[in-house]
Amino acid sequence: VAHLDDQGGNKVRLKWFGSNTNLHSVWDSKLIEYKGFSYTEYTSYLHDVYGCQRKTILRMSEEETLLYTYHVTDAIYQYHSTWSGNTYHYAYQWVETAEYQMYMAGIRLAKHLNDLF
């Protein structure tokens, strides 16, 4: 769920801890790298924090998932339009949302793969 006019955040320029980047990159990798976890550590962390929501995620329809993501995307763009440029505040504000989105995507992908095989 993205804004076509800015190519999903690729045209939205910003500074992340002093380095030039774009909004898409922040959400693709920078928020994840912010915690400094290895992949194994992050997997365990996400399971520990969000595992209790697994059944709820699996019950969500494709439409509900899309609508949830649409609202998250809308909130990100609204926040960005008034953002002061403080990277620490941005990370504090959005890292949990990014983590939940990752967890939700992983659970839904696993479900689809299990359904296929």
Cite the ranges covered by each PLM segment:
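C-terminal accessory segments of proteins
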Residues: 3-117
